[in-house]
Amino acid sequence: MINYIKSTEKDMDMLIESRMEMLKVVNNLPDNYKFNDDFIEASKIFFESSNQTTILAINEEKKIIGCASMCYIEIMPTFSHPTGKRAHLMNVYTNARFRRQGIAKKMLEILINEAKERSVTEISLDTTETGRAFYKSCGFKESEECMVLDLR
């Protein structure tokens, strides 16, 4: 049986471990890749203090097998988004051994329901090509209204 929980500070070590695993997979990094301590610390600070929710999927062995995060932001209200409340979905990941079991979909459903409770009018996300079909199957659509300026 898989349990789905909202992460708290007590889950921080498992949460960071899961995030680093996901980043290695998505970025094709070797298993022994060592993340910069500043990067890990910044991730911890984000999870501790940010306006976000992270759902963890935990198996019977008490191991995180999936995670998904929703970051909440407020913008100036517009006609199409009268509450000004938006969200950005990130870090959706299921361990390869547990894929195709509905875990990502369940985590996404939990986060979408919370977003609705918070009066969010739009959820955006960045996706890999591999994930695109999954998000489309969950009702997400390509957007032509977004542009990005990279400030790095």
Where does each model-flagged region fall?
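A short beta-loop-alpha structural element at the N-terminal edge
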Residues: 3-17
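Conserved acetyl-CoA-binding loop of GNAT-fold acetyltransferases
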Residues: 6, 120, 136-146
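Conserved GNAT-fold acetyl-CoA-binding loop/helix
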Residues: 23-43
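A short helix-loop-beta-strand connector motif used in the catalytic cores of GNAT acetyltransferases and
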Residues: 44-56, 88
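Conserved beta-strand in the GNAT
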Residues: 56, 63-72, 88, 93
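Conserved acetyl-CoA pyrophosphate-binding loop and the N-cap/start of the following alpha-helix
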Residues: 98-110
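Conserved GNAT acetyl-CoA-binding A-motif
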Residues: 108, 115-127
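Conserved beta-strand-loop-alpha-helix junction that forms the acyl-donor binding cleft
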Residues: 123-133, 148-152
